[in-house]
């Protein structure tokens, strides 16, 4: 390439970079104008604030120079030491430097711009580089690295990549700082696969061995490789690629990269979220072997997983190990333990932990009390739950929606409806769970119309009723034999975009069958089968039972036989309703065949199975078979129910059975 063509090429690249920076600044100015308009037209008076603010994605806008706390800084430049008492002074001197070209070079400009980078003003730094470009002050690799970092900090990754392309076109060799900055930018944008590919390239080409550049990176405000590496590891774990993250850590340890407690903590947390507690514990042991001291975050993550899995003894052992090693548990650690104990009904152990944390002067928070209150309510200890609420208020910890919901549920369970309603009225912002709890109470009391009023209140408050809300009300209407209202509500549910689930379908199917509306039930059943809702065994049991009650035993048998085609496994209840159907039409031989098939398929008959079949045999006059079944029933620990005993008593009264038969049932 000739000198003229080289100059032309550099000029084209230079012009392109200026255009990119101008685009970024124009976008910035538009963002600022919009924000200023919204805030009442606030203007920034200093002429230096022409340097645009690049809007940060998902963050607050950058502060003005007058808002930044700057305590002054001294720089050694070509002309000697210069002290800047304010950022405005630094901009003044920078303007003087670019006018004094070629006395001041990119090295001096970079030092001044570094002040703004360290003060978290990448927007100003970008604008100052624009001035350098306009004045034809050549940028060096150090300049490009700062510029790439500034674009990344402003979440303008496309500009960072464009700048990277331009520096390579100008013949500069990207270094570890360049790659590390881009890697960090990709991680910030959640472009983990691309970051992983770039990191792999860095490993292969030996860039990660240039650790001597760490000082330079810190000087201009860049993060060292290990911190960016942690960002990458965190990204992999967030995507569920924990095994890849662990393999990458092992690889980098082999290459001599120092892995800190943050890296291990990220991997341990990822493993725990996957439920792989064994690997997390192995990694904990490995940390100790490499003399990296685990912190409370790592211990808490493992303890939390152990508690969730019900391994409370292991969690307690690890908790004790923490204390022995001088690692102080925090409120999160205690909350994990308390919540774990509460979830498995170990309320007294949870109470003991609460006392322990208070003795250690670790203040419980609302999550601590919520776990204990919820457990108290589930255990039926409403008085203890009320005492815990009082303790919360005494400690100036204000109840949240979860607290109120637990207490309302507890009051409802103990039929203290007035207290539940009073607490509901106290809530500033009840959620849909709160409404569902109160609606359920109304429906159980057969006050479904009042439950419907609460459904309308949900909409008025800007909340959205969910599947549970509609299921509760539909069930309520079915219970009061108002199937038309139940159907109307079902249609409303669909029209409002709330998806019915298997429970919704089962409620309606049961309502139709119980009210002898078999045709409507079968019609709905057919519609559901064509939908995306997966019917469960309960749904088929309801329909088979409805068919048998409606004298459609043969059709019920056909449906029973088709269950494997639908991917449904019959349970004891399925066999019971079918056996009952056969007995109802006096098909005792079919009932007996199904009874034996039931046992062959691994389903043990229950009390209902035996009593149904015994009554069927007695009705058909098969006394010997009924005696055989009674003997088997008693040997399996079951006994005659009220219907069987009454039937036997009637047969004895009519003289069709011997009195000794009654003794066999007792």
UniProtKB/Swiss-Prot annotation:
Superkingdom to which the source organism belongs: Eukaryota
Annotated PPR repeat ranges: 105-139, 140-174, 175-209, 225-259, 260-294, 295-329, 330-364, 365-399, 400-430, 431-465, 466-500, 501-535, 536-570, 571-605, 606-640
Keywords, comma-separated and alphabetical: Repeat
InterPro entries for this protein: Pentatricopeptide_rpt, TPR-like_helical_dom_sf
Record family assignment: Belongs to the PPR family. P subfamily.
Protein name (database record): Pentatricopeptide repeat-containing protein At1g64100
């Amino acid at each position: 390439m000739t000198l003229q063509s080289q100059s032309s090429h550099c000029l084209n690249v230079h012009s392109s970079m200026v255009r990119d920076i101008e685009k970024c600044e124009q976008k910035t100015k538009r963002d600022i104008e919009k924000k200023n308009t919204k805030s009442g037209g606030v203007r920034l008076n200093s002429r230096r604030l022409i340097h645009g603010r690049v809007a940060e994605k998902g963050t607050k806008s950058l502060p003005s120079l007058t808002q930044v706390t700057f305590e002054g800084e001294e720089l050694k430049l070509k002309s000697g030491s210069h002290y800047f008492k304010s950022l405005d002074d630094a901009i003044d001197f920078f303007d003087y430097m670019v006018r004094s070209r070629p006395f001041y070079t990119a090295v001096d400009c970079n030092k001044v711009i570094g002040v703004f980078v360290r003060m978290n003003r990448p927007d100003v730094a970008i604008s100052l580089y624009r001035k350098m470009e306009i004045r034809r002050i050549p940028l060096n690799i150090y300049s490009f690295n700062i510029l790439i970092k500034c674009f990344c900090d402003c979440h303008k990754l496309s500009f960072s990549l464009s700048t990277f392309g331009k520096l390579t076109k100008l013949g500069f060799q990207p270094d570890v700082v360049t790659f590390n900055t881009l890697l960090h930018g990709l991680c910030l944008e959640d472009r983990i696969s691309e970051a992983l590919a770039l990191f792999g390239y860095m490993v292969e080409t030996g860039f990660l061995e240039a650790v001597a550049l760490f000082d330079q990176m810190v000087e201009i405000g860049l993060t060292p490789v290990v911190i960016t590496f942690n960002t990458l590891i965190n990204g992999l774990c967030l995507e569920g690629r924990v095994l890849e993250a662990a393999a990458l850590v092992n690889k980098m340890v082999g290459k001599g990269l120092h892995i800190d407690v943050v890296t291990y903590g990220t991997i341990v947390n990822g493993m725990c979220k996957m439920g792989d507690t064994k690997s997390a514990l192995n990694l904990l042991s490995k940390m100790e072997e490499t003399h990296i001291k685990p912190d409370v975050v790592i211990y808490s993550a493992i303890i939390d997983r152990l508690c969730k899995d019900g391994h409370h003894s292991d969690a307690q052992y690890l908790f004790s190990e923490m204390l022995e090693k001088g690692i102080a548990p925090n409120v999160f650690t205690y909350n994990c333990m308390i919540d774990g104990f509460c979830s498995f009904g170990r309320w007294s152990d949870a109470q003991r932990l609460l006392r322990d944390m208070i003795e250690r002067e670790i203040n419980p928070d609302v999550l601590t009390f919520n776990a204990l209150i919820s457990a108290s309510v589930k255990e039926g200890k409403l008085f203890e739950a009320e005492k815990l609420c009082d303790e919360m208020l005494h400690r100036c910890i204000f109840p949240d929606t979860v607290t109120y919901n637990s207490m309302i549920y507890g009051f409802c369970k103990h039929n203290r409806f007035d207290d539940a309603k009073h607490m509901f009225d106290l809530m500033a912002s009840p959620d849909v769970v709160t409404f569902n709890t109160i609606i359920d109470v109304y429906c159980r009391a057969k006050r479904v119309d009042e439950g419907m009023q609460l459904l309308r209140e949900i909409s008025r408050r800007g909340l959205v009723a969910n599947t549970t809300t509609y299921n509760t009300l539909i069930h309520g209407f079915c219970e009061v034999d108002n199937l038309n209202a139940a159907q109307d509500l079902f249609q409303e549910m669909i029209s409002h975009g709330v998806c019915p689930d298997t429970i919704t379908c089962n409620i309606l199917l049961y309502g139709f069958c119980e009210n002898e509306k078999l045709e409507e039930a079968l019609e709905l059943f057919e519609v559901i089968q064509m939908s995306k809702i997966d019917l469960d065994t309960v749904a088929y049991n309801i329909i088979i039972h409805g068919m048998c009650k409606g004298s459609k035993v043969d059709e019920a048998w056909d449906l029973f036989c088709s269950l494997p085609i639908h991917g449904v496994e019959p349970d004891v209840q399925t066999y019971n309703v079918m056996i009952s159907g056969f007995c109802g039409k006096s098909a005792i031989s079919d009932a007996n065949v199904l009874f034996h098939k039931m046992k062959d398929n691994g389903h043990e008959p229950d009390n209902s199975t035996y009593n149904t079949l015994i009554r069927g045999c007695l009705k058909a006059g098969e006394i010997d078979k009924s005696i055989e079944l009674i003997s088997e029933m008693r040997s399996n620990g079951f006994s005659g129910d009220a219907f069987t005993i009454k039937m036997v008593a009637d047969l004895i009264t009519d003289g069709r059975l011997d009195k000794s038969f009654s003794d066999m049932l007792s």
